[in-house]
Amino acid sequence: MTYAELLALARRFEGERLETVTGKGFTVGIYLDCPFFTPESSGYGQSDGRKAAERFLRRYNEIGSLRPGDYADVTRNASYYVVLVARA
């Protein structure tokens, strides 16, 4: 998966309620060509930047795992990214 494909997924689900693998609700948006995530629990948008998203994709393309823990060292938003790529 490429970064452009990840952005296309984020655009497709922008504003739609999604759930993490543990059932926690969130929405996805895009700001300055970078996905950001808003957990229902806090209501505050969060992103750790494009470089973290690219690191996630690099690892995802290598291992193909949908377990957020496999990406904990590359992004704090792994639980959100795995939901997006699972819907590709």
PLM regions with names:
Residues 1-88:
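Intrinsically disordered, charged low-complexity linkers and terminal tails
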